């Protein structure tokens, strides 16, 4: 199996590109300019930016000029923007606390815009599970509107490769999983220019919703299983942080934060009753040899380890280590979506057969999987756009989950990605993750283990 191949849409489509309208795109060093915009530039035959909305018309027009968007129209009215007939897809990339109002207004004002087919929103869908549920409910009333959520970690070539190895039985049945991560600026220091909402528990952006949220979504995706029950302990042991100057040096100035800086999480996966233990803390490792992210997956016939330099799996250029059973169909083509060469160091293990597994020497293999020159910040998001293009120009994928039957597709919409290799995460995938994160906070507050087997839609 090779799911790390290029998009099926390898040639320029005969019909016009998907016309994209952006909410929040500005020039400079903004997140959307460094990610979504660069991704679309690489897929110019499939996507074309035709509209921009920003709070002021001046900002929209300046961005159009600076980014040389010759086909784009600027807007300062969200209502007019949502009703613009020349838009096929709207991409929302603003601060998470603004998602609810922006997305709700788009859904309401675009109700008569039959040309609008796609609504793509950055994670998190909203600042709270209640807001997210409402947005999902409204979107479900739009029969011809396809939703997309930016859980781009699922598209990481390392995550896809790990999912392949597990689904092909290369490590046997999973016995246990351990995760440890460091969530960047949630420790003792933070940059002076870092936005304050990132440290406000009410904003919906924090160590748990962001670092843990993306990671646990990827874990469920890799293993093909949601959680059955979970238990969590949350701490804010660093309520005051030192500010760093523009050179990264600590100043004497301090500032308060209300979001957590530590999470202890335990859970049991539904499939195989696999125990999962997870620890996330704020800050970077004290020891330089300690990785910011480590995921260890232990099986009856082998092991997987995923390591990253940042505690954000969705934007980290990872390394995948594999020891287990060689599957003839599981080899990768050795290239990423941009044709970059892959480092795949393989070694036959000279080891006696294991008495516990009965594995012979010839069947065992080791692999280190890493992609040279792969930019995970842009590349993972680009792969979501490729999946959207495949869906738009070639039709919805028909494959099933790699682990058992999955929900049937709706007649016209891609309902949810679930655990499929193909497709893209939707608002339904977002709601499932929002509910799990909400359960994590409730478990800590109620000081008990919670049954989360009913959170799926």
UniProtKB/Swiss-Prot annotation:
GO BP terms, alphabetized: galactose metabolic process
Region named Disordered: 333-364
Any one GO MF annotation of this record: DNA binding
InterPro entries associated with the record: Gal80p-like_C, Gfo/Idh/MocA-like_OxRdtase_N, Gfo/Idh/MocA_oxidoreduct, NAD(P)-bd_dom_sf
Entry keyword Transcription: yes
Cystine pairs: none
Nucleotide-binding found in the keyword field: no
Protein origin, superkingdom: Eukaryota
SUPFAM superfamilies in alphabetical order: Glyceraldehyde-3-phosphate dehydrogenase-like, C-terminal domain, NAD(P)-binding Rossmann-fold domains
Keywords assigned by UniProt, alphabetized: Carbohydrate metabolism, DNA-binding, Galactose metabolism, Repressor, Transcription, Transcription regulation
A Pfam family: GFO_IDH_MocA
PANTHER family, alphabetized: CONSERVED EXPRESSED OXIDOREDUCTASE (EUROFUNG), GALACTOSE_LACTOSE METABOLISM REGULATORY PROTEIN GAL80
Function: This protein is a negative regulator for the gene expression of the lactose/galactose metabolic genes. It seems to block activation by the transcriptional activator LAC9 in the absence of an inducing sugar.
Family designation: To yeast GAL80.
Protein name per its UniProtKB record: Galactose/lactose metabolism regulatory protein GAL80
Organism (species): Kluyveromyces lactis (strain ATCC 8585 / CBS 2359 / DSM 70799 / NBRC 1267 / NRRL Y-1140 / WM37)
Gene name of the encoded protein: GAL80
């Amino acid at each position: 199996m090779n799911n790390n191949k290029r998009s099926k849409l390898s040639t320029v489509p005969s019909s016009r590109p998907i016309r994209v309208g952006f909410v929040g795109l500005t020039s400079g060093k903004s997140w959307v300019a460094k990610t979504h915009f660069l991704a679309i530039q690489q897929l110019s035959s499939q996507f074309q930016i035709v509209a921009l909305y920003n709070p002021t018309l001046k900002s929209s027009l300046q961005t159009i000029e600076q980014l040389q968007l010759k086909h784009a129209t600027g807007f300062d009215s969200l209502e007019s923007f949502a009703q613009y007939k020349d838009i096929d897809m709207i991409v929302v990339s603003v601060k998470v606390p603004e998602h609810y109002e922006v997305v709700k207004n788009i859904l309401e004002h675009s109700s008569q815009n039959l040309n609008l087919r796609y609504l793509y929103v950055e994670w998190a869908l909203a600042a709270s599970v209640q807001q997210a549920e409402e947005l999902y409910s409204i979107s479900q009333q739009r029969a011809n509107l396809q939703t997309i959520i930016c859980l781009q970690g699922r598209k990481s070539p390392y995550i896809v490769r790990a999912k392949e190895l597990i689904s092909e039985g290369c490590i046997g049945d999973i016995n246990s999983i351990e995760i440890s991560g460091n969530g960047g600026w949630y420790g003792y220091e933070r940059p002076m220019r870092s936005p304050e909402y990132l440290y406000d528990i009410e904003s919906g952006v924090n160590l748990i919703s962001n670092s843990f949220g993306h990671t646990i979504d990827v874990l469920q995706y890799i293993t093909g299983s949601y959680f059955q029950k979970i238990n969590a302990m949350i701490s804010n042991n660093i309520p005051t942080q030192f500010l760093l100057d523009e050179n990264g040096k600590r100043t004497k100035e301090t500032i308060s934060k209300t979001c957590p800086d530590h999470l202890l999480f335990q859970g049991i996966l539904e499939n195989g009753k696999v125990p999962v233990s997870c620890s996330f803390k704020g800050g970077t490792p004290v020891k330089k040899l300690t990785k910011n992210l480590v995921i260890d997956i232990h099986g009856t016939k082998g092991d997987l380890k995923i390591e990253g330099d940042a505690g954000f799996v969705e934007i980290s250029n990872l390394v995948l280590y594999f020891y287990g059973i060689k599957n003839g169909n599981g080899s990768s083509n050795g290239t990423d979506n941009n044709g970059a060469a892959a480092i795949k160091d393989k070694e036959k293990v000279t080891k006696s057969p294991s008495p516990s597994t009965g594995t012979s020497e010839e069947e065992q293999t080791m692999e280190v999987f890493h992609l040279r020159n792969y930019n995970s910040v842009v590349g993972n998001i680009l792969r979501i756009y490729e999946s959207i293009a495949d869906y738009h120009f070639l039709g919805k994928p028909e494959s099933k989950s790699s682990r058992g039957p999955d929900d049937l597709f709706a007649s016209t919409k891609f309902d949810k990605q679930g655990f499929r290799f193909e497709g893209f995460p939707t608002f339904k995938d977002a709601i499932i993750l929002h509910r799990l994160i909400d359960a994590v906070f409730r478990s800590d507050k109620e000081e008990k283990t919670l049954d989360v087997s009913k959170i799926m839609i």
